[in-house]
Amino acid sequence: FVGDVFGAPLAAEGVLAFFLESTFLGILLFGRHRVSSRVRVAAAFIVAFGATFSGFWIVVANSWMQTPAGYEIQGDKAVLTDFLAAVFNPSTMPRYVHTIAASLAAAAFLMTGISAWYVRKGRSLDVAARGVRLGLIVAVVASGLMFLTGDFSAKQVAETQPEKFAAMQ
């Protein structure tokens, strides 16, 4: 019924983000003795960008299911009428920023934990101590952003889906 609309963000994720990630992940993993360290660092950043971009399209698809926009019913199926309205529906950006903040917080806590383990074992103390400090700073900032965007998302749900908001309470 909604394949023409719902398929668009999934196709964008597959074509744009997934291939970007997989190509540069291959360079990152298998290019150690084949490409320079600068190329490998660039590949790592491109993989991170690709994963973030992939997450955007996945959130777009989920957000469209929650607050559909940019389509109309024609006969027995939904037809995409405004791609940008479907992509940037009322819940896309709050959900996406919340997801990115949560991902950063999780990664920062992981980095902090691994760095703290190195400090405890007395290995690579210089790098490990910087890892603990940076990890904690990013974790605190990302967690604060996560709380703010979570509140904003809840207000958006209350506005666009009052029944769902009532069930959340």
Question: Which residues make up each language-model segment?
Answer:
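Polytopic transmembrane helical bundles with strong interfacial aromatic enrichment
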Residues: 1-169
